[in-house]
């Protein structure tokens, strides 16, 4: 009997969600090496014996799940694969230094197509001063899977985990939220129209911002640098890859606390609001921010004593505060009612 046929006590993947699945699969894996400081359970593993520690993370993008070649330029895909991997380094308050790239492809991709993919990889490496130092190319029966291992470094005293938030800390987020998912919605809408009418030529100029946010996200290495210049070490941090709600719940779980964020303080770009207004299901912009994902902004908490240093930082918004252990994670609406935050499970793209 094959592994796929094994049915006794079967649990479907979508019953757990990505992070509960990782937790279940890695249960019992304890660090064996003395220089393993942090294993599974954060944005990066942390290793090393000296003052400067090594950060290691891995991220995969799968065709048909994380990207659609009908509207994803290969150069953008290469750039994005590196960007989302080194975003994990930023989420630990570190600096990315090296990457390795693994690509599995079918024979429908040409050498020239892979050269275009690697041109995007090179562009992101050049922008963020990262070296490509290895990798692997393998075969796939269908589609492409692109995996990037990111390596970085951080001073031991500045590494920021998810578990350091404490009651009364301020909750901050960089940039704006929901725009990447809004870009995906536009692309999926235009794809459906094109499939029904191949002569259709979409006009996407007015969606330039949300499209770039989805197709070519930028890791917020700049925020890490400015925080360091201001002498601020966040008490906890995570990157917003799966939506604000999911990331807040990660911090609350790991830090054993609750939180309150204020709906009117969540930063949302006007193009996101516009896209939501065009959708037939009356989508709320704040829903994109909470559950959309793909923004790769930094969500972090700071001690109240650092408020003066952070409150005027360009592109950083204070959206709420951490509450006591046992308190729920909620969003406060403009009408002063509360909505309990819920994380999404497995979701394609």
PLM features per residue range, with description:
Residues 72-76, 210-215, 235-236, 286-288:
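Short pre-catalytic strand/loop immediately N-terminal to key active-site residues, enriched for Gly-Thr
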Residues 46, 85, 93, 132, ...:
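Residue-level signal for inorganic ion chemistry
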